[in-house]
Amino acid sequence: MKNFKVTVNGTEYDVAVEEMGGAAVASAPAARPAAAPAPAAPKPAAAPAPAPAPKTTAAGAGAGANTVTAPMPGTILNVGCHAGDKVSKGDTLVVLEAMKMENEIMAPHDGVVSEVRVQQGASVNAGDILVVLS
């Protein structure tokens, strides 16, 4: 029987362990800790990426129209706007279900809905145009 002292969360316990039958197993020698690698030279900071320009449609929308796209694939649960509706920045345009979570897709700026390209129950991919604002 071997006795050990074990500390768990700051509390010390005396533990007795008895070997039960079977052949003795030779244990491997304790491995020495590997030498710590030399710290790498710090990399220069990368220049920040420019902010993406608002996405505009090539066809079917007037000049200055902006699109609201799906950020991820999913299913449209609710369309909360119609063509001709005036919307303010932050208004919920569409509710998209993705990975069993409801994601509110909001208006990026004030404007008028010129076209709604999805309907309730539609499946969309990331980048698909949901709503066109002007």
Swiss-Prot record:
Keyword Membrane attached: yes
Co-factor requirement: biotin
One Gene Ontology term, aspect cellular component: plasma membrane
Domain Biotinyl-binding: 58-134
Main subcellular localisation: membrane
Gene3D superfamilies xrefs: 2.40.50.100
Comp. bias (Pro residues): 39-53
Any matching Pfam family: Biotin_lipoyl
GO BP, one annotated term: sodium ion transport
PTM sites of type N6-biotinyllysine: K100
Subcellular location(s) of the protein: Cell membrane
The keyword tRNA-binding is assigned to this record: no
Alphabetically ordered keywords of this record: Biotin, Cell membrane, Ion transport, Membrane, Sodium, Sodium transport, Translocase, Transport
Low complexity composition-biased segments: 28-38, 54-67
Enzyme Commission code: 7.2.4.3
Catalytic function, reaction form: (S)-methylmalonyl-CoA + Na(+)(in) + H(+)(out) = propanoyl-CoA + Na(+)(out) + CO2
Chain segments carrying region Disordered: 28-67
Function per UniProt: Biotin-containing subunit of the sodium ion pump methylmalonyl-CoA decarboxylase, which converts the chemical energy of a decarboxylation reaction into an electrochemical gradient of Na(+) ions across the cytoplasmic membrane, thereby creating a sodium ion motive force that is used for ATP synthesis.
Record text on subunit structure and interactions: The methylmalonyl-CoA decarboxylase is composed of four subunits: the carboxyltransferase alpha subunit (MmdA), the tunnel beta subunit (MmdB), the biotin-containing gamma subunit (MmdC) and the delta subunit (MmdD).
Protein name: Methylmalonyl-CoA decarboxylase subunit gamma
Biological source species: Propionigenium modestum
